[in-house]
């Protein structure tokens, strides 16, 4: 699992938490794979460690825009 702090288009910080995920080639996805990328996600609103976040369960729920 990993938690990423992302910035929405309006400047709002959004916490994104993922389960351990593999990409389409079976490689483990790390924060380096998402760093600096513009993404759209599909997940659920969750509460973890005192913060609301969006939890993503599958790599296919992350759409890369760049």
Predicted features by range, described:
Residues 1-66:
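OB-fold single-stranded nucleic acid-binding module
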């Amino acid at each position: 699992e990993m938690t990423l702090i992302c910035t929405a288009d309006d400047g709002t910080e959004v916490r994104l938490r993922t389960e351990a995920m593999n990409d389409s080639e079976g490689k483990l996805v790390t924060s380096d794979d998402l760093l600096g990328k513009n993404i759209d996600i599909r997940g659920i609103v969750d509460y973890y460690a005192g913060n609301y976040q969006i939890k993503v369960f599958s790599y296919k729920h992350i759409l890369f825009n760049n």
